[in-house]
Amino acid sequence: MALGDKNQGSSKSQAKQKGTKGKNAQPRLKSNQLKRLKINEELKELQSRVDNFVPPSEITLFSELPMSSKTQKGLKSSHFLNPTPIQSLAIPPALQARDILGSAKTGSGKTLAFLIPLLERLYLEKWGPMDGLGAVVISPTRELAVQTFMQLRDIGKYHNFSAGLVIGGKPLKEEQERLGRMNILIATPGRLLQHLDSTVGFDSSAVKVLVLDEADRLLDLGFLPALKAIVSHFSPVQTAPGSRPSRQTLLFSATQSKDLAALAKLSLYEPLYISCNKPGEEGVMPANLEQYYAVVPLERKLDALWGFVKSHLKMKGIVFVTSGKQARRVRFIFETFRRLHPGLPLMHLHGKQKQPTRLDIFQRFSSSKSALLICTDVAARGLDFPAVDWVIQLDCPDDVDTYIHRVGRTARYQSAGTALTILCPSEEEGMKTRWGEKAIEVKRIKIKEGKMGNLKQSMQNFAFKEPEIKYLGQRAFISYMKSVHIQKDKSIFKIDALPAEAFAESMGLPGAPQIKLGNQKAAKVRGPSKEELARKAEKEEEEEEERAVVGSDEESEEDESEGLGSEDEEEEIDDEAEEIDDEEESGEESGSDEETEEEKDASKPKAPAVRTKYDRMFERKNQSILTPHYTALIAHDADNAAGAGEADDDDDVFTLARRDHNLSDDEEADTDAILGAEALAAELKKPLITSEDLSKRKLKAAASKKGLLKSRPGPEKVLFDEETGEAREFYKSGVDVEKEMSAADKRREYLEKEREIMKIQDKIDKEVAREKKKELKRKRKERERELRQMEMGDEPVAYLGGDDDYASADEGRSLSPSPAPSLEPERHAKKQRRGGVQESGAGDLEDEEALALRLLQGS
C-alpha cells in the first residue's frame, strides 16, 4: 500500500510540473474524458448520417448503410458482406426508428433485418448495463429463439450489451435472477408473459425496440391473447400528443393474414409495409426450389418413405408430420425405422421433448452432412438448417401457408433444394385448388412399385415382440385420425375416405383402435374468418349461460309453487344422476347419445331452458332431511301427536309406571340432570351419519369388500398356551405380565433361565467334542494297524531304486499286479522318516540286497 501511494504521489507531482510549464499552458484532460468526448462526437456524426441517409436504388454492400463501426466489424467477421433484398429495404427505415411490417419469402435473411436496427438503436441511445432491458425479441418456438440468439451473438460481439434467452425448460427462479442483468431479451411468448406477470422488479417500461419474429406463426399457435398482454406491458411512451412513441416495433413474417393486420394496428404506429414479393404472389417460393407431389394410399405412405430413404442414403432431409399431438407418430416412425437400420443417421424432434434434448438434436442435425430429421411443425418456421437437400411432407399440410414454411427449410437464399409432398387420393384435388389460388406450381410424379418398400411384416413383428411399439402405434393411429378430424378445410381432409383398417394393419396393429371423436361442430367448415368464428362462439356461450341461469330460476320457482314432489320422482332424479355418473366413468358413446336424445325429448314439452348434467347434480337433495317424503312423515307425526294421545302411548317403547308421584324440587332437578346426561351419552354413542343419510352409491360402495374392510375391526394377535392350549390375546397378556412384576424382576428371571439353558447346552457340546476326539483316535489306530499288516506281507515291490539296466531288463514283466501297492512305499518311507534317518537307511539297504538276490536267482 505504501509503495502504491508513493508512486501515485510521484505521478501526480510530475503531472503538476508538466501542467505548469508556461504561462498560457492549458490543463491536460484525462484519457477517459477524451474517450467519452470522442464517442459522443461519433454518435452525433452517426445520428446525422442516419437522419440524412437517402437509400440508393440498389444497396450491394453493408458498408453503404449508416451503421456503427462495431456492427460493421461484427458483420464482416461473420462473413455478411452483401445484404439481401429484404435487408436492403427494411434496414434504412428501421435505423430511422420507423415501425416496420415486413414480409419476404423464406430464407431471405429476415433475422438480420431486425437485429441490425436493434443493435444500432441501443448504441445510439448509449445503452449500458445499468439501464436495464432495452430490446425484446419474441419468437414462436424455442429453436428459433436459440438460432436468433446465436446470430445476435455473432454480429454483436463487439458491442457491450448483455443478451439472454428466456424460453422455458428451466426453473423460473434461475431466469428471474438473470432478467435484471439483460439489455436484450429473446423469449417465447408464454414464458415472457409469465415473467411480466409474476417476476418482482421486472421493469419493462424502458423498452426501446420490440420485435415479433414469425408473427403469423405466433397467431397460429394461439398466442394472440398473450401477445396483446405483452404489448400492453410494453406500452409506448409519447412525449407529445402528435409525436412518435419512444418504442419501435418491428414485425416480420413470410406470410400475411387478417389477424396479423389486427395485431399490427394494435402494436405498430404508422407502420411502413415492406414486401419483397411481387403483387399477388404473397409467400412466393424460392427460385431454386423444385416442388413435387405424389399420390400414395394412406397404408403405403411408410413404404414410400422407406423406399425414398434407401435410395437417398447421402442426402440431408427433413420429414414433416402433421401437428396436433403428433409427437407419438413421430416417435413411432423414428423407433420403427431405427430398428430397420436404414444406413442413414436418424433424428426426431417434437414439442414434447425436454429443452436440452431439443437443442442437442438441433445442433447435431445442423452439423451433420447427411441425416434424416423426423419432426412436427415445431421445425417449420424460421430455423436455418444448413445444406438441406430434401423436404418430405409425409402428411398433407394444414394450409398453403404451412406448406410454404415447410418447404422453406430447403433452398435457403441462393442454394438449391427439392420438396416432395405425399398426398392421399382424397386430398389431391383440394390441395391442387389451394395451390392454384396462391399461384404455386407443384409437379406430380409417380413412385414406382419397385422403389417402394414393404414394411407390413416388419411392423407386425415389432408390435408382437415389443409392447412399447404396439402402444406407440395405437396412439399414433388415434392422433393422426383426430388431427384429420379437427382440420377446418373439409374439401381436403375427409376422414370418411381414409381406410382405417388398412392403415392400422400397415402399422402392425391387429385392428383399428376405437376412437372417440369430438362433436362435429368443433371441426368448422372452411368459410368465415377466425375473428368471426371467435365472436360467434362467444355469443353462443353467453346465450347458453343466460338460458341456463333463466332455466334454473324458472325451475326453482316452479318447485316452490308446486310444493313438494312425491318419493318416486326423487328416486327417478337420483337414478338419473347415478346413470350420468356411470356414463362419465365408462366413456361409452352409445349410452351418452341415447341419454342426450332422451333429455332433448323430455325437455321439449317442459321448458326451453337447457339443463345439463351438472345442473341436475347440484339440484340433488339430501335423502334424509330435505326430501319431500321425509317432510311428509314429519307432518304426519305432528298430526298424530295433536290428534291421538293414547295411540302414541301404546306405541311408546318406555312407559311410565306411576304418573301421580310427586317429587321435591331438588329431586326433580337431580333426576332431570341424570336423564339429560343419559340422553347426551346415548346421542354421543349414535353415529353421526347413518345408512339413511347415504345415497345408493355410497351404500353400494360400503357393501363392497373394500368398504367392509374399512368398517370391520382390525385383526388381533392371539397366543396359545403350550401346556393347556388355551388361547389368549397377545397384547392383553403382555399388559397382565407387566402388572405382575417390575422390569428389574423380569430381567433377573430372564437371565437365570438363560443361564440354566446355557449350562445344559454346554454339557451337550462337551460330550459331542469328546465323542469326536475318540472317533478320530480310533480311526488313526486302525489305519496304523493296516499299514503294519501290509509291511509284514510277501507282496512284490513296485519300483526299483537301482540302475537303469535292471529297470530295462525288468520292463518285460509286471512285478506289481495292481497300482494300489505303489502308494505303500511312500507311506512306509514317511513312517521311517518319522522314526529316524539311520533306521530308514538300513531298512532300505536290506530290502535292496534281498531284491537283487531274488532277481539273480530268477535269471
From Swiss-Prot:
Catalytic activity: ATP + H2O = ADP + phosphate + H(+)
Any matching Pfam family: DEAD
One GO biological process term: rRNA processing
UniProt keyword terms in alphabetical order: ATP-binding, Helicase, Hydrolase, Nucleotide-binding, Nucleus, Ribosome biogenesis, RNA-binding, rRNA processing
Domain Helicase C-terminal, residue spans: 288-463
Subunit structure, interactors included: Interacts with the U3 and U14 snoRNAs. Associates with pre-ribosomal complexes.
Protein name (Swiss-Prot/TrEMBL): ATP-dependent RNA helicase DBP4
Organism (species): Cryptococcus neoformans var. neoformans serotype D (strain B-3501A) (Filobasidiella neoformans)
